[in-house]
C-alpha cells in the first residue's frame, strides 16, 4: 500500500512540476506541437504545414507583445499550436496573437532571417508556379492527363486536356471525377472562376477554371462537354483578351494576390470587389480594403452573403486615375437575392491617402447601394 501511495504522490509531484514549467510540456510529458500552416482561410480544405523552429518559438513565447488598435492584416500564413491556429504572420514577417490582438515586437535578427527562409519554402510548397499560356501549352500537351486541385475546398480530380488554342479545354476523366468537380461547385454547374493547382509530372502550376460544361465532349464521364482552364496570358475566344476574373484567381493560386493588390487600378478594384462579393471570397476582398473598411467587412459579412449573384452589366471607364486621390466609378450591376433580382446603377467610391499608396473602396457607401 505504501508503494502505491508513494507512486501516486510521485506522479502528482511530476505533473505539478510540469505545469509550472509552462505550456511547452504537456501533462503527459509530451512537447507541444507547433507548426507553420499556410491556407487562404482558416476554413480552407487545402493547407500546407511545416515544423515551427524551436528558436523562433522561444522568441514568440518570451518576446514582448504590444496591443494593436487595427485589425490583423490579411494573410495566408499562420502558426498552429496543438492543432489550433493561434498566431498570424503577415507578408512583412510581423507575428500577431490572433486572440489577444497583439503584435510581437521585432524578432531577433537571426530568427527573422530563418522566418523569411521558411516563408519562401512554405510558399513554394503550397502554391502553384505562375506560368504563361505558352509554357502551359507545351507542358500540358493535348491528351495529357493531370490532376486539378481546388485551392479552397482541397478537393481534387483528374482531367484530360482535349483541345484549346488560347487556354486548355479539358474534361473530367471519369464519372467519379465529374462528381468531385460538381461537389466543388456545390452541386450546380457554374461559370464562377476558381483558383486551382494543376498537378502534373512536369510540375505544380497556378491556374483558374470555370465549372460550366459547354461545347463537345469525347469521354464517357457524365460531363456534357468540356470546361476551360486558364493560365497567365490565356485569353477568351470572344474578347481575345485575358479575363480579369481568371487573372485574379491565377494570382490567388500562385500566392501573389495579397501583394498584387497593392498595384491594382481603380477599374481592377471594382471588378475584384464584384467578383469577391459574387463568390463570397473574402480572401480576395479583404486585402483591397483599408483597416476601416476591413472592420466593416467583418460586421456586414452576413449581409453580403445574402447576395447570391452580382454581375457588372456596363463597361468600366477608360479614364486614367494615376494622378488622382479619389476616383468614383459608376456602373450598372445586376444583384440577385432570394427576394428577387434588381438592376441598378451603383457608384464605387475609390480613394487613397497618397498617389504612392494602393486604392481602396468605400465599403460603407457601397453597401448602402446594394
Task: Label each PLM-derived region with a short phrase.
Residues 2-27:
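Sec-dependent N-terminal signal peptides of Gram-positive bacterial secreted proteins and lipoproteins
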Residues 27-63:
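Short Lys/Arg-enriched alpha/beta "domain-start" segment
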Residues 101-130, 137, 238-268:
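Pro/Ala/Gly-rich low-complexity, hydrophilic intrinsically disordered segments
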Residues 136-139, 320-370:
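Exposed beta-sheet edge and beta->alpha loop/turn motif
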Residues 180-268, 275-276:
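Exported/periplasmic cell-wall-interacting domains
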Residues 254-303:
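Core segments of small alpha/beta cavity-forming domains
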Residues 282-326, 339-341:
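Short solvent-exposed beta->alpha transition segments
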Amino acid at each position: 500500500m505504501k508503494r502505491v501511495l508513494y507512486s501516486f504522490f510521485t506522479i502528482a509531484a511530476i505533473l505539478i512540476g510540469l505545469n509550472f514549467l509552462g505550456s511547452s510540456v504537456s501533462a503527459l510529458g509530451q512537447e507541444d506541437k507547433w507548426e507553420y500552416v499556410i491556407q487562404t482561410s482558416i476554413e480552407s480544405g487545402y493547407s500546407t504545414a511545416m515544423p515551427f523552429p524551436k528558436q523562433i518559438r522561444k522568441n514568440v513565447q518570451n518576446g514582448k507583445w504590444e496591443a494593436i488598435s487595427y485589425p490583423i492584416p490579411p494573410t495566408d500564413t499562420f502558426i498552429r499550436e496543438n492543432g489550433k491556429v493561434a498566431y498570424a504572420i503577415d507578408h512583412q514577417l510581423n507575428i500577431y496573437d490572433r486572440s489577444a490582438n497583439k503584435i510581437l515586437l521585432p524578432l531577433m535578427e537571426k530568427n527573422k532571417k530563418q522566418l523569411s527562409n521558411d516563408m519562401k519554402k512554405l510558399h513554394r510548397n503550397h502554391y502553384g508556379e505562375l506560368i504563361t499560356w505558352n509554357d502551359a501549352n507545351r507542358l500540358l500537351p493535348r491528351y495529357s492527363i493531370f490532376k486539378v486541385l481546388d485551392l479552397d475546398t482541397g478537393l481534387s480530380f483528374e482531367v484530360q486536356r482535349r483541345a484549346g488554342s488560347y487556354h486548355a479545354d479539358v474534361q473530367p476523366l471519369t464519372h467519379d471525377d465529374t462528381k468531385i468537380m460538381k461537389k466543388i461547385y456545390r452541386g450546380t454547374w457554374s461559370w464562377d472562376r476558381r483558383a486551382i493547382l494543376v498537378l502534373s509530372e512536369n510540375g505544380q502550376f497556378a491556374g483558374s477554371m470555370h465549372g460550366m460544361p459547354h461545347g463537345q465532349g469525347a469521354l464517357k464521364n457524365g460531363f456534357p462537354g468540356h470546361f476551360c482552364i486558364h493560365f497567365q496570358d490565356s485569353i477568351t475566344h470572344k474578347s481575345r483578351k485575358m479575363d480579369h476574373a481568371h487573372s485574379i484567381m491565377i494570382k490567388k493560386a500562385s500566392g501573389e494576390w495579397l501583394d498584387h493588390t497593392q498595384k491594382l487600378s481603380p477599374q481592377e478594384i471594382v471588378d475584384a470587389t464584384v467578383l469577391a462579393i459574387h463568390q463570397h471570397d473574402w480572401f480576395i476582398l479583404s486585402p483591397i480594403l483599408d483597416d476601416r473598411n476591413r472592420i466593416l467587412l467583418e460586421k456586414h459579412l452576413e449581409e453580403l452573403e445574402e447576395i447570391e449573384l452580382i454581375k457588372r452589366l456596363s463597361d468600366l471607364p477608360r479614364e486614367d486615375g494615376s494622378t488622382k486621390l479619389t476616383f468614383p466609378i459608376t456602373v450598372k450591376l445586376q444583384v440577385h437575392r432570394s427576394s428577387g433580382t434588381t438592376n441598378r446603377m451603383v457608384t464605387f467610391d475609390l480613394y487613397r491617402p497618397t498617389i504612392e499608396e494602393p486604392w481602396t473602396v468605400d465599403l460603407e457607401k457601397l453597401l448602402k447601394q446594394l
